[in-house]
Amino acid sequence: VLFRSLVEKEKYQYSSTPPYELISHQNLSAEEGLYLKHFEDIFDRYYNSKRFRFSINYLLEKIDPNTLFSRLLEHHDSHGLLMNPVSLDEYYRIFQDTFYPAPTSMEQDLLKLDYLYAQRSFRLPQILASKSPGKTWKKDRKTPVIPFNHEIEICGSQANLKVAANTVYYAVAHAQNG
């Protein structure tokens, strides 16, 4: 009874089937509610997934969080990708197209690092791949050794990159059980 009186008083509109999502109320239009739902989806895909931890931290030094995620939302919206599945490799292309259309070597290295940290993969997507000597890490003989233009120091979710005089090679290995 209390809920019903609140619904009427505040003019809540919600979907009639589970999960009973809010559509609008007297202070939030349906359009604003949909925008928030899409913004949350983009935030989950890029930030909460931790797939772009280093690139996002780098960008947050230059632009505010709302601008960052709004730009990703605009890209997804303009390409018909909202609330639709996207391949993992495609996320990295979208991120690069949105923020690094002509990536610097630092931006390219950050995206490579993000990909290698987030994916248990033995290859980079085409947009991040560079000529590699085809070597693998001696310890497991399958983890690729990837060329970078920077010396990299990781501290939590922050990556400190320092321009290297020569190409530096790194292998990002994941624990077997997690």
Regions found by a protein language model. Give the residues of each.
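Polar, glycine-rich mid-to-C-terminal structural blocks
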Residues: 22, 30-33
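Radical SAM enzyme core and accessory elements
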Residues: 33, 38-178
